[in-house]
C-alpha cells in the first residue's frame, strides 16, 4: 500500500501476471489448530486461500476499495531491476531485488501436496471482504470515509 499511496503511476512487474492465493491469518490459524488437534502432522500441507488472483487484479481491487485512481503500467524487466537496485539503497526499501525475483513465480498451490481444502479445512475469508475491513486507513478521509449506516 505504501507504493500505491506514493506513486501516481504504479509499475506492474512481470506485467502483473504473477498469481497468488492469498489466505487470511484467521484462516491460517484455524488450519494450524485443526492440523494439530486432528494429528495430521505427517503430511506437507499447502495452505491456500479460496481464490486465485493475479497481482494486477489485486492492485485493481485495492485501488477500487481504497477509492484511489492510479495508472498501472507494465515495467520492462531491466527498468524493474534498476528501480529495485535504487530502492535497496534507501533505509527502508520499497522494493528489493529478492522481492522482484519472487514476483517472477506464481505463489499458488503446486499440486504436489495436499492443500487445506483437500484435508477438509477450506479457507473462508475472501480477499475483498477482508481488505474492506481495514481499507479506511488508506482512504482520503480515513475512518470518516465510512458511510454512516456502516458505523
Predicted regions and their residues:
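A conserved pocket-lining segment of Rossmann-fold NAD(P)-dependent short-chain dehydrogenase/reductase
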Residues: 2-23, 31-48
Amino acid at each position: 500500500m505504501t507504493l500505491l499511496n506514493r506513486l501516481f503511476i504504479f509499475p506492474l512487474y512481470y506485467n502483473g501476471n504473477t498469481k497468488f492465493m492469498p489466505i487470511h491469518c484467521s484462516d491460517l490459524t484455524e488450519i494450524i489448530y485443526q492440523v494439530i488437534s486432528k494429528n495430521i502432522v505427517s503430511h506437507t500441507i499447502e495452505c491456500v486461500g479460496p481464490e486465485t488472483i493475479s497481482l494486477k487484479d489485486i492492485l485493481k481491487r485495492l485501488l477500487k476499495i481504497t477509492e484511489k485512481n492510479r495508472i498501472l503500467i507494465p515495467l520492462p524487466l531491466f527498468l524493474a531491476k534498476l528501480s529495485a537496485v535504487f530502492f535497496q539503497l534507501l533505509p527502508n526499501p520499497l522494493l528489493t531485488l529478492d522481492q522482484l525475483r519472487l514476483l517472477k513465480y506464481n505463489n499458488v498451490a503446486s499440486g504436489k501436496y495436499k492443500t487445506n481444502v483437500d484435508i477438509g479445512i477450506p479457507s473462508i475469508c475472501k480477499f475483498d471482504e477482508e481488505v474492506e475491513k481495514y481499507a479506511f486507513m488508506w482512504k482520503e478521509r480515513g475512518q470518516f470515509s465510512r458511510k454512516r449506516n456502516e458505523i
